[in-house]
Structure formats: structure tokens, C-alpha cells
Amino acid sequence: MDNWLALFDGQTRYFLDINDSSVKPDVLRFRGSEALSEPFRWDIEFTSPQADIPPEQVLMKYATFRMRGGKNVHGMVTRLEWLSTSQDQSHYRLTLSSRLALLGYTRQCAVFQNQSVPEVVEQVLRKHGLEGADFEFRLERTYPPREIITQWRETDLQFIRRILSEVGIYWRTEMDDTRELDTYIFADSQLNYQFDVRLPYSEPSGLFDGAAESVWDVRTWHNIATGTVATRDYNYRTAATPMDATVSVRSDAVTTGEHYRYAAPYRDAGDDASPEPETESGAFYARLHHERELNRSARIHLFSNAAHLTPGQVLEPQGDVITALEEGVVLTLVTYRGARDSRLHVSVWGMPYTERYCFRPAEIPRPEIHGTLPARTESREKNDIYAHLDEQGRYRVRLDFDRSDSEPGYGYLWLRMAKPYAGDTLGWHTPLIDGTEVAIAYSNGDIDLPYIAYALHDSEHPDLVNRDNHTRHILRTPANNKLRMEDKRGEEHIKLATEYGKTQLNTGHLVDAQGQRRGQGAELRTDEWGTIRAGKGLFVSADAQAKAQGEALDRDAALKEIDRLNQQLQQLEMAAEQALALKADVDSQIEMFEQRLKPLNEVVLFSAPEGMALTSGEHLQMTATKNVAINAGGDISAGVMGNMTALAGEKLGLFARTGQLSVKSGEGAVEVQAQNASLRLFAEKKLTLSSASDISFAGKKRITLIGGGSYLRLEAGKVEYGTTATYIRKVKRTMFAGANSTPTPSISIPLVDDLIRNGFFDEQFRILDDSGKPMANVPYFISSENGETFKGVTDNQGLCKRVFSKESAKLTVWLGVLALERW
């Protein structure tokens, strides 16, 4: 239409109005470029009688470029160039740009979390002052929120173009003539093309095209396209789930081969058999990339003089057209060229329209980070003494470049930490607490695939090893759990310690907190309780094993000593047997030696070549369910300052093979009783009883003295003596008196109850009052769950008689009247 009007009126066909400016441009010539998913740019040359136009009069001003045929371009002046000045006028060139072009002047490093691509784009647009009427999302798909979207050293324009290209969303520009602003439509399907754009296809005749709007001079390019796109990715969150997808979009293009894309960023494989796979799945990205390949399989170029042609339209050339134009042409790039003295030239690029696939912007690669970025681990509580982890052991961090005011503990996504060793609930993980400096690395440089590479010390968190202790290797936790290894020659040591109870294992050259020597060898200590437990057996030895050479369980020295003493004990046993003394149970000791000590079978064996001592500030107790054996190749000495007691449930034997058996009391009496049997004294030689005072013999029934065939019997008030030889009595005087007798001294022999019965379970109760004192003479009745009963009264110590049972059973006790009722 502009060309048609120019034939008659000779007036200016192009106008440039700059808002809020005194500059009145007269358009000389122009060149414009508009494309899908790109900001438009119009370079306009103009003349003005005003010389030296101040830049502030033009730059960052809204402006409108109008054609008399009806096309209006609203934008922002972003560039002004002075070309020349004559006597009458000055010659300038300015650039009229899309408002989106202004996003190219803001470069950011930013992190967006848990937002979808459209949400992030909208946030960026609104940050630059664009409102709801300035843009519109016409999307057929629902886009899921991403865990993270990173903007890295990109302008805001580069950033939104990149993330939109990743998901195949394109955008086109429309002009709002009412508000005189450019607006933007974001779309993801063919449904949002502009249809019903028709122009006749007419090749120009000669140098004149008749000024009628048309298209002409079609050119086409056809290329072989990839036949199949296959994708694969790895998602550590579902490590065992296959992440493969293969897609081939039906088309008329000639295709061959396969494009395999590994590490395409997606979380789920998706259904690659579906024509509409789940958004942002592996199948979605495979289809998207194949659509891009098909976009390049056929290209169309046309010339036109129609000013209203714009990217995003589906142009339907009318008339006798080639096959490539029959379904229409999706306009992807339109350039305009015109001047004050020449007609409008429009150059159109596009691709054949098809319902099988849509225009997709070329994929813009993500920026890559092939190093690390500084960050700090972050907890929800400042200075948290414990690591802030999720159920997978991942961390939150705050990147040093992040300027957002996000809530503590939510500044970045959950991150895995690289470790020197990992496996199924096994590995090496030393948790990092709030404020620890870490280096964030990126898998294959992908800015949206971060992980913690390692931790570092800094000025606020100094290294625990430095020039002052450079010979040490230290692992220390915040609670001062510590593994320290000293490599200083001649002072090597290892310390494993925890603050709880000051529990430590120290080996080698032992030092104190100041590094001063306090011992050598090995030390295991704690302020709390200690346990050494070995289920198969424990060998504790002071036998030397130089330079750690030899078997760990080398017990030859200890076993030889035990075997030698057992042989000596066997000889003593034989002598005791010949002397009719009580035999020692040597067989059980030999059995233990063979079955327990030699194989170290569930026993504890102590060995020391030069001596062993056990000491206690209070009590020292040795107990055994069966036997206690003490053997010595020399002497056994037992000394006590109080009482010494030897109690035997059955027999007690003392046998001295070659020396004397001596029993002496320095102050108290010596008392020997056979409470329920005989008492025998025998000597192969002379038997002597002597006293510095009196000797009394008392027998309740009789006393009989026998010697050399003669006897003396005292019985039932009679004195009887007899001999087979001479009876000699040598006395100075003999006195006779009346009958008399001396009573036999009464000796009380207590009844000793059984305390232990082999093969029986036993229990004994003590009855105490509220003050804790024993209660004597209290009737009691005890019943077991297997029917056995026991009754009696408590003694002076409040004790009931010990009860025995062959089976373990629950006991019930009644006291006092309740007990008497059951008697």
C-alpha cells in the first residue's frame, strides 16, 4: 500500500515520532529485522535541522515508526549515531528496539528455586517493569517447577531466551497501537500462530511490480534430517530407574541416522510412545530436539512488498504455487528495507507449515562452570552446632554470589557432597556444620547440576594443621572427637579420643596437652565405665614380640608355663593319693588347658614373663561357676590384716608333701571341730600335746586312752584301767574322799544348712521394716508357680531359709497373718 500511495501524492510515507522529545525527525531510509524469539531492531536514518542533538533527548525514549500503509512499530530508542551535518540539516541514525532489548543491559548471577520456566520468565519481565498487559503466555502444556534454574553471567535477555529455548517456547511481538507499546506472546504450539494471512503469488514483470501487495521469487532448501533422537540421563534420586527415551516425529522430510543425547537434563524418562509425552521428561526433550532437526529440513525464502508481514504468521500464497507453499509458510524472520525515495522491500524467511510439529527456537547452550564456586553450608539456625541434613544426607548452602535475601537454610537446593568412599549405607561422611566454606562443582560444567566437591578452611575457620604442628595428621569433629597421628620421627603416636568421659586410646609416644612426654607404649583410659569384650577369647600378654613380628595369638610361652605347672600338680596329686589326702581336681585343669586355653576358646588368658599383680583399693573378688585353680612353681603366700576364711561346701584338704603343716594362733584360740563326724589326729612319730597352762579332755560318753597294750577308760561315772603287765603307781600321798563328778562342758554345734546344691536354682529373702532394719520371728509362706511351698519364721537377721528348686519359677511371698492363714 505504501508503494501504491507513493505513485500519486509524492508525500513522505514514513514517520518517526519520539515521545517526550523536541526532536522532529524526517525519515530518510530504514532497515528493520523481526524474528521469532528475538527482539526486533529497526535502524532508521533521518535528517533534522537540529544539529548536535543531545543524546538524552533521544535515548531511552519511547518512539513509534509509522508507515502510511498502516504498519506501526512501537519501541525504545537504544542508539543514536551522528553521521554528518550540512548547512541546512544534520544526518543521524538511531536504533528503535524492542523493550525486551533493554533486558540485555542487565547481567546477573542469580538462582531461582522451585519455579517453572514460565514463572521465572514472568518474574524477570516484571522486574523490568513489564506488566500483565505487556505479555501473555498462551501455553498448551503445563510446565513443572524445577528444583533449580541458574542464571550465570548472562544478561536477562540471554537468560530468558535460553530457558525458553530449553523447553521449546517461542515468542512473537505484537503492536498495541492504543498504548503505543510493543507486547509479547509466548506460545508452545502451532495453535498460536497467526492464520488467515493471504497474498497473491505474482512474479514481477520487468522493473515494476504494479505496487500491489504480493509475494514472489520463492526459493526453497531441503536437507536430510536426523531420523531419530535418543536421550539418556542419570538421576541419583532414582538411581536404579532406566532413563532412556527414543522419539521419531513423523514428517515428510528425508531422514536417516540417530542423534544420541546423553545427560539431557530431565528427572523422568517419560513415555516415548506418546505423541504428547510428559512435559520436561526425557521423551519430551527427545521430541523437542527432533522437531528442531525437522525445522531445519526445509527452508523457504520469499520477497514481498507487504508491510504487514511479521514473524509468527502463517502466510498462504495464492495462485499457482509450488508444493512447498501449498500448506502455507510459517514466517520466522522478516526484514524490511525502504527509503524516502524508494519502495518498501520485504524479505521473508520461513518453513513449511505442518500440524505434526511446531517451530522451536534454536537451543541455546547453558553457560558452563568448569571449576568451583565458593559457598557456605547453611542451617535454619545460625551457628547451629549440628549439620543441617535431609533424609538423603544432603546439605543446604548459600553461594557467595547469591544476593537474594532468602530465608536461612533455603538459599539453594539440597546438595550431595562428594566423598572419598560411598556405598549402600556405608561410606565416609564427616558432617559439615553451619558456616563451613565449601567448593561447589558442577557435573560436566552444567550450572543446574551442582554438588559439594570439598570443604575448605578460611580466615574465620583456620586449619587445624599448620606450620606449628606440620608433622601431625588430624581428624577432629566439632565436639572434639579426635583422631591424631604424629609423624615426627622418634615421637610417633596415635591418639583416638572423645570428650565424653575423656575416653582415649593412646599409642606410641604419649604426650600431654602441651606436647610434653608423659609416657610411651599404649594407654586405654576413661573417666566412665570400661569394657573389653571378645566373644571367642581374649589374650592379654606382657611377653615381648619384637617389632610386631610373629602371630598375634602366639601363646606358646604362656601355655608352656601352664603345662609345666600342671605336670607338677599331677605329681603332688599322686603323693596326696598315696597319703590318703584329699586329691586336687587336676583333671578339670588339664581339660580346661586342652579344650579352652590352647585354642583360646571363650576364655581370658593373662601372661607375664616376670610377674603379675592385682590390687584393689577396697575389694578383690575371684569367682567361678565350677573350679578355681591356683598353681605355683614356688610359694603361695596369702597375708591379711583382718580375718581369713576358707569355706568349703563339701571337703577341705591340706597336704604338705615334704615339709611341715603348721597352724598357729598368735593371740586367739585354735579351735578344730568335726560337727557331724569324727576328729582324727595321727602322727607317724611322736604326737605331743602341751600347754603352758591347763589341758582338759572331755567326752560326753567316755574317754579311752590306749598305749602299749594298757588302757584307761572313763565312762558312766566309772574309772577303769587295765594292763597285761605291771601297774606301778608312784605317789607321795593318796587321799580318799566322798563321791564327786565334774560336768562335761556344753559345746553348742550349730546346724549348717545347704547353701549351694548342684543343679538347683535357689533364692533367699530378707525382711526389713520401713527403717531398713531386719525383722525377726516373722512368719512367712513362699509358693512357687510350679506348686512347691516353703514356710517358717525369719531369724535374727530377718532372713528366710534359702529355698531350692530344680526349675526356674516365679515365687510369691506372704508375711505375718497372711502367711499363717496358708500354713
Regions found by a protein language model. Give the residues of each.
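Amphipathic alpha-helical and helix-coil boundary elements used as assembly
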Residues: M1-W823
